[in-house]
Amino acid sequence: VSVPMRALLGILATLLLALPAPASADQALAPEELFAAVCSSCHALGRQWDHRIGPPLGGLGNRPAAAIPGYPYSEALGSAKIRWTQAELMAWILDTNGRLNDTSMVYQNSLTPEETQRLARWLLEQD
């Protein structure tokens, strides 16, 4: 192997060592980062509707669905007898339209079940 080739191989080896390792459970996104990545373009935290596309997600813990005054919920969600528990919120995030037909929320879940669980637990703790 020539000297220039050895130098190139050395540079490549150094670059490969500098690449980040695959994410482990310790490096998983925090729930607030998951919220920022998949929820915040349509939803805010808090309890007052700020005219975003979706209703605010603060104070969800055991709150009935469609409970934010002034928000134009779909008829389906408005008439559903849903309370936001951990199980209900996880089912909603994992498959919104499978959970309730004719909802106005258009969302394709891109989270793993573990990420969904962390996000749901965190959302239920937000005021």
Tell me the role of every PLM-derived stretch.
Residues 26-49, 57:
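Sequence/structural segment immediately N-terminal to covalent heme-attachment motifs in c-type
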Residues 55-56, 103:
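Extracytoplasmic/periplasmic beta-strand context in beta-sandwich domains
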Residues 67-90:
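Short Fe-S-cluster ligation motifs
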Residues 85-127:
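C-terminal capping alpha-helices of c-type cytochrome domains
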Residues 21-25:
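Sec/Tat signal peptide C-region and signal peptidase I cleavage site
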Residues 9-19:
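Bacterial N-terminal signal peptides
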